[in-house]
Design a protein with these regions (language model features):
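A structural "flexibility-hinge" signal
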Residues: 1-176
Length: 176
């Protein structure tokens, strides 16, 4: 089951946090970031997808070294729709961040300064997508199928965040 399918499942499950408003807030933040940076939404989604690969790798390392609960703790603590440099610092060192900025810039055509400005917004948004599978009453407890799907992906380097954002947008448009 893909990432968006897991998010839809979480929306249908009252025991999980996902809801249409949460998805709408994430989509709205992507659109606002795009507007603020003068970048089209598709490019922002591509940047988010490339960054998602690095977030997955960082969370996989956390999970292998400290367990599922610590990976979930990072998702819970740093997810959101506002810029959060601490979210970036919790996952990436300074040297790794330079590599990430260069990779995103190369793959999107954006300049490094724009990418560097976008990352503190995009990391919390990626984590917010992953938080949709958290337990609604006690996010630190229980399994998070959205996070598990994300972390257990096939490792082909393709994180389906762009597809997930596009499908979420269509899903929300059909509901309105």
């Amino acid at each position: 089951m893909g990432l968006f399918d897991q998010i839809l499942s979480a929306i249908d499950d009252p025991n999980q946090q996902a809801n249409p408003n949460q998805l709408g807030n994430i989509l709205g933040a992507v659109e606002q970031l795009s507007g603020n940076q003068g970048v089209n939404t598709g490019t922002t989604q591509l940047a988010m997808s490339v960054l998602g690969g690095y977030v997955r790798s960082a969370l996989q390392n956390v999970r292998s070294q400290s367990g599922d609960a610590q990976a979930q703790q990072i998702v819970n603590q740093f997810s959101g729709t506002n810029p959060n440099p601490q979210a970036v610092q919790s996952l990436f060192g300074a040297g790794q961040l330079t590599q990430i900025v260069n990779d995103i810039a190369q793959r999107t055509g954006l300049n490094n300064a724009t990418v560097r400005a976008m990352i503190p917004v995009l990391v919390p948004l990626v984590l917010n997508l992953l938080k949709t599978g958290s337990n609604a009453q006690n996010p630190a407890q229980g399994s998070n199928p959205v996070l598990n799907t994300f972390l257990d992906a096939d490792g082909d380097g393709d994180v389906d965040i762009t597809d997930t954002i596009s499908m979420a947008s269509r899903f929300l448009n059909q509901r309105s």
